[in-house]
C-alpha cells in the first residue's frame, strides 16, 4: 500500500482534476440517454485515472532519459527560475529509473484492462478511442514521435483530455455520443491545453536547455505567446456562447461566465512573466483551492504554482458548473 501511495503521489495526483472532472462532465451529459449505465461509466473513469497517472510517469521517465532533469539544474545554476519538481524521487534515490518504468507500465496495464471491460460491453469504438489515447499519451514524450519535443505536446494534451476523453466517456456511459459533447469537449480541451501551455511558458529556459521544443517555444515571440494565452483562456467561453446562440446548447451553459476573471488573471500574469514584470503572488478566494501556499512560497515555487493552480482550478470549476447544469436539466426535463 505504501508503494502504491508513493507512485500515485509522484505521478502528480494533484493534476487528476484535469482528467476526472471532464470525465464526470461527460457522464452527466450521458445521463439523459436511455442506455445510460453507471457501471461501465465507473469502470471507464477508473481507467482514465490510471491512464493519467501512467502517462505522467511516462513523461517523467522519458524526460529523465532525455536529460531534462540535468538541464533544469543547469538553468537554475545560471540564475533563472524554473519548475524543479520532476523526477526528484529518482534524484533522491527513493526510486530507480527501472522502478519508474515498471510503475508506469503497471498503471497503463490496469487502464488497458479497464478499457477492455468497457469495450466488451460497448463495442469497437471504445477500443479505437483507448488505443488512440494510449498512442498519444506515450508519444507525448516517448519515441519515436516525441510530440512534446516538437511543439505539439500542449495541443496533444488538449485533444486527449478534451474531445478524446469526453467522447469516450460519454460512449462508455450510454453507447452513443451527440453534438453537445463535441461543443463542450472542444471548450474543455482548450482549457486543459491552457494548463500545460502556461506551464511551458513558465519553463521556457529549462525546455530550451533540454532541447524540448514546446508549443510555447515554437511561437518564439512574447506577443505570439500572449496571443495564444488569450486564445486558450477566452475561446472556451466563446464556444459555449456560440453554441447557445445557434441552439446547440441550453442557455444554462452560460453559467460558466462568472469564471472569466480566472482566465483574465492567467493572461495578465503570463504577460507579467513574459515582460519580467513583478506582480504579487497572493491567493484570492475566487482562484479556488491553493493547497499549502505558504509552503510553496518557502520553496520559492509560489510564482509557478499560483498560475498552474488557477489554470487547473479553472478547468475544475468549468466542468463542475456544467455537470451541475446537466444534472438540473435532466431532472427538470
Please give the residue ranges for each predicted region.
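Topogenic membrane-insertion module of multi-pass membrane proteins
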Residues: 1-43, 47, 55, 145, ...
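Small-residue-rich segments of transmembrane alpha-helices in multi-pass membrane proteins
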Residues: 21-26, 155-170, 217-221, 285-295, ...
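Membrane-embedded alpha-helical segments that form the functional core of polytopic membrane enzymes
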Residues: 24, 33-58, 70, 126-138, ...
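Helix-coil boundary and interhelical linker segments in multi-pass alpha-helical membrane proteins
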Residues: 27-46, 112-128, 165-186, 240-253, ...
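Acidic (Asp/Glu-rich) catalytic motifs at the cytosolic membrane interface
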Residues: 48-80, 194-216, 221, 225
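Multi-pass membrane catalytic core of lipid/isoprenoid biosynthesis enzymes
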Residues: 72-120, 216-247, 295, 299-319
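Intramembrane alpha-helical segments
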Residues: 87-176
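Extended hydrophobic alpha-helices typical of membrane-associated regions
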Residues: 245, 249-333
Amino acid at each position: 500500500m505504501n508503494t502504491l501511495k508513493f507512485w500515485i503521489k509522484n505521478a502528480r495526483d494533484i493534476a487528476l482534476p484535469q482528467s476526472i472532472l471532464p470525465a464526470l462532465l461527460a457522464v452527466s451529459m450521458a445521463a439523459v440517454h436511455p442506455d445510460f449505465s453507471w457501471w461501465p461509466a465507473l469502470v471507464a473513469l477508473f481507467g482514465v485515472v490510471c491512464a493519467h497517472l501512467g502517462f505522467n510517469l511516462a513523461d517523467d521517465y522519458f524526460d529523465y532519459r532525455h536529460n531534462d532533469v540535468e538541464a533544469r539544474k543547469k538553468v537554475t545554476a545560471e540564475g533563472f527560475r524554473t519548475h524543479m519538481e520532476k523526477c526528484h524521487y529518482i534524484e533522491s534515490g527513493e526510486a530507480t529509473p527501472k522502478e519508474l518504468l515498471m510503475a508506469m507500465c503497471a498503471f497503463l496495464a490496469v487502464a488497458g484492462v479497464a478499457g477492455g471491460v468497457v469495450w466488451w460491453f460497448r463495442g469497437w469504438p471504445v477500443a479505437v478511442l483507448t488505443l488512440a489515447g494510449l498512442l498519444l499519451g506515450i508519444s507525448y514524450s516517448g519515441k519515436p514521435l516525441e510530440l512534446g519535443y516538437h511543439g505539439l505536446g500542449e495541443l496533444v494534451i488538449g485533444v486527449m483530455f478534451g474531445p478524446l476523453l469526453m467522447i469516450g466517456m460519454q460512449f462508455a456511459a450510454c453507447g452513443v455520443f451527440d453534438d453537445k459533447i463535441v461543443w463542450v469537449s472542444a471548450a474543455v480541451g482548450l482549457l486543459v491545453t491552457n494548463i500545460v501551455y502556461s506551464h511551458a511558458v513558465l519553463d521556457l529556459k529549462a525546455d530550451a536547455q533540454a532541447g524540448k521544443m514546446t508549443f510555447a517555444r515554437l511561437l518564439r515571440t512574447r506577443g505570439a505567446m500572449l496571443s495564444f494565452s488569450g486564445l486558450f483562456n477566452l475561446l472556451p467561453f466563446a464556444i459555449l456562447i456560440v453554441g447557445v446562440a445557434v441552439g446547440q446548447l441550453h442557455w444554462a451553459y452560460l453559467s460558466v461566465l462568472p469564471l472569466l476573471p480566472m482566465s483574465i488573471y492567467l493572461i495578465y500574469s503570463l504577460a507579467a512573466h513574459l515582460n519580467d514584470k513583478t506582480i504579487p503572488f497572493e491567493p484570492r478566494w475566487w482562484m479556488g483551492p491553493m493547497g499549502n501556499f505558504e509552503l510553496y512560497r518557502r520553496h520559492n515555487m509560489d510564482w509557478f504554482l499560483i498560475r498552474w493552480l488557477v489554470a487547473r482550478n479553472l478547468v475544475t470549476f468549468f466542468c463542475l458548473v456544467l455537470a451541475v447544469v446537466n444534472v438540473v436539466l435532466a431532472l427538470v426535463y
